[in-house]
Amino acid sequence: GFPNDEVRYGFLNFLVPYYTDVTDDETGFHIAKFMRELSFGDVDAFMERLKVFFAGIPYELSNGTERHYQAVFYIVFTLMGQFVETEVRSARGRADAVVKTGDYIYVFEFKLNGSAEEALKQIDEKGYLIPYALEGRKLLKVGVNFSKEMRNVDKYIVIEE
């Protein structure tokens, strides 16, 4: 663990250049845009930015394992700050990421060489949206498939509940 958020975010900012070609001075710019897009409910723009982010990862930095892609997702989502929780435990499983904004709650599930449909099915079967049903915000589930071959997002599906 980290003694405080400042140390945690500093460490994660330090890691970004090792996993991507984003420089230290660009990190805040990217993260702010990610948050703005989700705050306005623009999942398509968010996912396109995520694709660009992944496309910038040099081939030699990508070892093609699911753990590598999870690490990059974790870094991006964690740098988004207090709006994001990763590996969110519920009664029947663990959602990969939950993003909360003023008007929206997004539950993300990621698959590597699976399908976006499988990811959505897991959200439904494990009841990942149930804990947020009474919060009064729009609930969106986002199933994302990541292609090991393409080393990027292959397909995503967004469904509003």
PLM ranges: what are they?
Residues 1-118, 125, 147, 151-161:
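Extended alpha-helical interface modules used as scaffolds for assembling large macromolecular complexes
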Residues 74-78, 122-142:
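Metal-dependent nuclease catalytic cores in nucleic-acid-processing enzymes
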